[in-house]
A protein has these predicted regions:
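Catalytic machinery of carbohydrate-active enzymes
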Residues: 2-306
């Protein structure tokens, strides 16, 4: 009996065998697709890294995803000249209520991100993708036949076959001239932890929110003394984070930047998609309220200037 007919027969006669066969057929389908498509792409990437002195990268993901790819590019820049081309206005496969746009990286966000990317000296060129020749396409991580609920910094390790250093800073910016020694918060509507709240932060001073106004207004309901700064671009955002006492945020471009700068930081971990992880010193994450409050108290006592 052909596998497809057998599957439907077992669906009504033997649930256990049906599920086992269904799983096998799905795995066989994944393997076939991997062998026919993705494996070839990964092998070509290894060949180009070995044989070329200049590498062109493509990334069409979110701003946070782009920042998360920088450790691999920085590592390869030690032996190659690296150019990054950014895909803009690529549609989301699924639109979710907490997305701000139907695109992974809309044009206005691309323009916000460019000054930060262009300021990194290991990127010899950063431009919008317009059909340039590409050696390493970071977008293929979305086609991996594996769950993406693992460390999102490591997605790009498995595209390039490079184990990059994520304990040392891989973003370099100057400190902000005016906004210094603040507790900097960046909390988006996506990847929130419904088990916790920020109300206890009202007893802290020097709180500043960076992000969009509606996110600030939402958090202001819980933190009366929360201030707002409208960053002109992600470079200014990075400078404010670099100058902070410590950073608090959920999985977002703000946390990705804080992770790249290696400032003291606390991640609001997402119970629904736990794919962001802190690495290095003074890097914390939490799922529960008591732990959140304890981490904030520790960093406040350690870094507050009297």
């Amino acid at each position: 009996m052909p596998d497809l007919l057998k599957k439907y027969w077992l669906k009504f006669t033997n649930k256990r065998k049906y599920l086992a066969l269904k799983n096998k057929l799905n795995k066989d389908k994944e393997l076939k697709h991997f062998k026919e498509h993705l494996e070839k792409d990964l092998n070509e990437i290894q060949f180009k890294i070995k044989n070329k002195k200049e590498l062109n990268f493509l990334h069409s993901g979110t701003s946070g995803d782009l920042v998360n790819s920088l450790p691999v590019i920085k590592e390869l820049s030690k032996t190659h000249k690296c150019r990054l081309y950014v895909g803009v206005d690529k549609p989301l496969e699924k639109f979710r209520p907490n997305n701000y746009s139907p695109y992974l990286l809309p044009t206005h966000t691309y323009k916000m991100l460019m000054p930060l990317l262009k300021s990194q000296n290991y990127l010899s060129e950063v431009e919008r993708f317009n059909g340039q020749s590409i050696d390493i396409n970071f977008d293929i991580f979305r086609n991996f036949p594996v769950s993406l609920q693992f460390d999102n910094l490591r997605y790009y390790f498995h595209v390039a076959g490079i184990q990059a250093d994520v304990l040392s800073p891989y973003i370099n910016v100057n400190e902000h001239e005016k906004i210094k020694n603040k507790i900097v918060i960046h909390r988006t509507f996506r990847y929130r932890n419904h088990l916790i709240n920020y109300k206890f932060l009202q007893k802290f001073n020097d709180l500043v929110f960076i992000g969009v106004m509606k996110e600030y207004e939402d958090l202001k309901k819980d933190i009366n003394n929360l201030q707002f700064h409208d960053c002109k671009d992600h470079l200014e955002m990075a400078m404010i984070i670099k100058s902070s006492r410590f950073f608090i945020g959920n999985s977002s471009v703000g946390h990705s930047i804080a992770e790249g700068l290696k400032v003291p930081r606390i991640l609001e971990a997402s119970p629904d998609f736990p794919a962001a992880y802190p690495h290095g010193d003074d890097a914390y994450d939490f799922y529960f309220q008591n732990h959140f409050e304890k981490q904030c108290a520790y960093l406040e006592n350690k870094y507050k200037k009297n």
